Amino acid sequence: ATQVSEVTSGMYPKNLLLIVVSVGIAVMLTIGLFRIVYRYPLNKTFTFLYLAIFGLAYFSTNDLFAIAFDASGSTTGALTVPFMLALAVGVASLNRKTQSAEEDSFGLVGIASAGAILAVLILGLFVRSDEPLSGSMPGHEAVAANWLAPFLHELPKIAGEILLAVSPILIIFVLNHVFFADQKLSKRAFRRIFLGMAYLFVGLVLFLTGVNAGFMEVGRKLGMLIAGMDSSIPVLIVGFVLGVLVILAEPAVYVLTHQIEDVTTGYVKRGIVLGFLSIGVGLAVLLSVVRVLIPWLQLWHYLVPGYLIILALSYKVPKLFVGIAFDAGGVASGPMTATFILAFIQGVAEITPDANVLLEGFGMIAMVAMMPIISLQLLGAIYQRNSIKEGL
C-alpha cells in the first residue's frame, strides 16, 4: 500500500487502499464460507469471480490492472494464510459425512485473493486517471556505518504492524471463549494458545524485519549485477533458480503443504506439491524477467491467456486440486517473494535499456500468484490419469 501510494503520487492513499482491500477480502471471505456450507462448486465460483475481474479490468488502465493483481498476492502472507486454511477446514468439517469435505477444505485463500483484486478495480472506477504513473519508487538507503541500523529502523514499524494484525484474532478468540463457547478450554490449552501467539509475534517480527531490512537491497544489487552481463541468458537462468529456491523459504507454503497431506490422509504427497509449486514460481519469475527485457510485452499478455487456461483446467481436473491450486497461488506470493524477488526484478529493470523501473515493479507478484495455479492443476491432471490407469 505504501509503495502504491508513492508511485501514484498519492492518488491512491495508503490508508484508503488498506481499507478497500480489507473490505474486499472480508466480503469474499464471507462468500467463501457460505460456499463451503452450501457446497457450491468451486470451479463455477472462480469462473464467475474472474469474469467479473476481467470485465472490470476492461475499464481500468494497465497500471491499475497490475496493481490490483499484485494486491491479491501481497495480502496472503504468513499470518492470513494459516488462519484462512484453518477456518476453511473447520467449516468443511461440518460436512464431514459428505464426499465434498476434502474438496471444501481448500479454495478459501483463492477466493479471498479475488476479493482484493475486485476491490482495487472497483476503487479505480471512482478514483481514475488516464495519466501514466508519475511518482517514484521508495528510495534505497545507502549502506549504514552500523550494520544493525537498518534492522533497528525496521523493527518498531514491523512490530506495530504485526501487533495490529494479531490483536483482532486474539480479542475475538477471548470474547468467544468467555461469552459464547459451550465447552471451555482447559487452562493448559488456553496457556498453549497464548504461548503460540507469543511465538507467532516474535517469529514474524524477526522474520519480516530481516526480509525488509536485508533482502530488498541484496535482491536489487543481484538483479543489476546479472542483468549487466553481455548475454540475457544468465539473468533468465538466475531468475528461474531464484523463483524455485525462494518459495522454499515462504513460511505459509509449509502450512499449506502439511494441511494438504493431512486432509488427503497422505494421498497427495507434500513433497510433490512443493516441487510443482517451486517450478511454477520459477517459471513466473523467468517470464517476469522476459517482460522486462521485451519492451512491448504487457502484463495482460500473460494474465488473460493464463487465467483462461486456469478456468478451462478447473473443469477438467479433480475438484480437490482446483482448491489446492488457487490456495497455492495465494500462498506463493508471500513476504519473501514480495521483497527479494520484487527487488531482483527492479534491479534488472534498472540496468535494462528501455525498461521502466516504476512499471516493471508491478505485475511480478501477479505472475507468481498465477503460475502455481496452472502447475498444480496440471499435477491434478496427472493424479487423475494415474487413478484411471490404476482403475483399469
Give the positions of each predicted feature.
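Helix-loop-helix junctions within the multi-pass membrane cores of secondary transporters/permeases
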Residues: A1-L51, I233-S314
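Cytoplasmic-side transmembrane-helix entry/capping segments in multi-pass membrane proteins
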Residues: P41-L51, D104-G110, R188-A198, I272-L277, ...
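Hydrophobic core segments of alpha-helical transmembrane domains in multi-pass membrane transport
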Residues: V23-R35, L49-T61, F83-S93, I111-F126, ...
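Signature of multi-pass transmembrane helix bundles
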Residues: S72, T76, V81-L85, V91-V218, ...
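Transmembrane alpha-helix boundary signature
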Residues: A1-V4, N62-L64, F207-R220, I247-P251
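Membrane-interfacial loop-to-helix junctions in multi-pass transporters
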Residues: M11-L16, Y58-S60, A78, F194-M197, ...
